[in-house]
UniProtKB/Swiss-Prot annotation:
Signal peptide: none
Annotated spans, Transactivation domain: 1-200
Changes after translation: Phosphorylated.
Name used for this protein in its record: Regulatory protein E2
Statement: the UniProt record of this protein carries the keyword Repressor: yes
Subunit structure, interactors included: Binds DNA as homodimer. Interacts with protein E1; this interaction greatly increases E1 DNA-binding activity. Interacts with protein L1; this interaction enhances E2-dependent replication and transcription activation. Interacts with protein L2; this interaction inhibits E2 transcriptional activity but not DNA replication function E2. Interacts with protein E7; this interaction inhibits E7 oncogenic activity. Interacts with host TAF1; this interaction modulates E2-dependent transcriptional regulation. Interacts with host BRD4; this interaction mediates E2 transcriptional activation function.
Length: 368
């Protein structure tokens, strides 16, 4: 057990150093997934030995460690393959090489520079969904990688590799899911593309393959992702504010004013805002809420417990908002303090990795 604990400590320490470094070097991200793979192997072995905890860390079930190990192997292999191409010289972030981004449509492709597309169903401003068009999509073609751009037309969002289109968002299916009239309007920057009557009357005429199937490229009225400016990092799947437009019965392209796609990044360091707040409840507990990728938060929590335990009161496990209306999909760790002075001392001493965002606040709940 002691040998596994030492190896796990060293592995997680290296992971946290990579998170703090926040490198854009692809070699560092290959190393990151090697460490993730090693961590999964150690936890799997610990569970086989009958261990439920290693220090303060809970040992997950065998299936969990096995699945994470397989994911790490998959990511390591694809990144090592990408490392052999000219795209290895481009800057790459941890988020762009994460497993979550790898599984984001279009799946099993690397993606960069996403831009919001808002689709309004049934002509109703309150019935809209947001999707993402990626400026750069890295597709594996036999033994190499090809960089292409995704585009939008009345049928969906797609990218073209060679002479074939791959649709990874099918507006026909989305309209069946979220609407009742099979009509939709695509709002992309200052452009609106409306569903044609032929599309709304029958789905057979625009049968769109899944993202793993290719169809010959056709002439349409696409909108390139490279013409837009408002970028987001991950595809939001929440209800969004609609854009007022007149209904369309045929394929059309209209120009409207700029569309506010919204800033999906979390605001950090709201210290001044909370300082001005009237905290009349003397029993309110000062807190800091950390948000980021689950494994990064786990390693950060381990370091806090190991080296900075005197600078805070309590620390939570990693948790997520369960509501479908949650503003983000980040993992969260909450830390409580005896006083605002202790919290400020914590912030002055502890180095927070740039991949972790934090907010200050108060918790009125009486803690046991």
């Amino acid at each position: 057990m002691e040998a596994i604990a030492k190896r796990l400590d060293a592995c997680q320490e290296q992971l946290l150093e990579l998170y703090e470094e926040n490198s854009t070097d692809l070699n560092k991200h290959v190393l990151h997934w090697k460490c993730m793979r090693h961590e999964s192997v150690l936890l799997y072995k610990a569970k086989q030995m009958g261990l439920s905890h290693i220090g303060m860390q809970v040992v997950p079930p065998l299936k969990v460690s096995e699945a994470k190990g397989h994911n790490a192997i998959e990511m390591q292999m694809h990144l090592e393959s990408l490392l052999k191409t000219e795209y290895s010289m481009e800057p790459w972030t941890l988020q762009e090489t994460s497993y979550e981004m790898w599984q984001t449509p279009p799946k099993r492709c690397f993606k960069k520079r996403g831009k919001t597309v808002e689709v309004k169903f049934d002509g109703c401003a309150n019935n809209t969904m947001d999707y993402v068009v990626w400026t750069d999509v890295y597709v594996q073609d036999t033994d190499s990688w090809v960089k292409v751009h995704s585009m939008v037309d009345a049928k969906g969002i797609y990218y073209t590799c060679g002479q074939f289109k791959t649709y990874y968002v099918n507006f026909v299916k989305e309209a069946e899911k979220y609407g009742s009239t099979k009509q939709w309007e695509v709002c992309y920057g200052s452009t609106v593309i409306c569903s044609p009557a032929s599309v709304s009357s029958t789905t057979q005429e625009v049968s769109i393959p899944e993202s793993t199937t290719y169809t010959p490229a056709q002439t349409s009225t696409p909108v390139s992702s490279s013409t837009q400016e408002d970028a987001v990092q991950t595809p939001p799947r929440k209800r969004a504010r609609g854009v007022q437009q007149s209904p369309c019965n045929a394929l059309c392209v209209a120009h409207i004013g700029p569309v506010d796609s919204g800033n999906h990044n979390l605001i950090t360091n709201n210290h001044d805002q909370h300082q001005r707040r009237n905290n009349s409840n003397s029993s309110a507990t000062p807190i800091v809420q950390f948000q980021g990728e689950s494994n990064c938060l786990k390693c950060f929590r381990y370091r806090l417990n190991d080296k900075h335990r005197h600078l805070f009161d309590l620390i939570s496990s990693t948790w997520h908002w369960a509501s479908p209306k949650a503003p983000h999909k980040h993992a969260i760790v909450t830390v409580t303090y005896h006083s605002e002075e202790q919290r400020q001392q914590f912030l002055n001493v502890v180095k927070i990795p740039p991949t972790i965002r934090h907010k200050l606040g108060f918790m009125s709940l009486h803690l046991l």
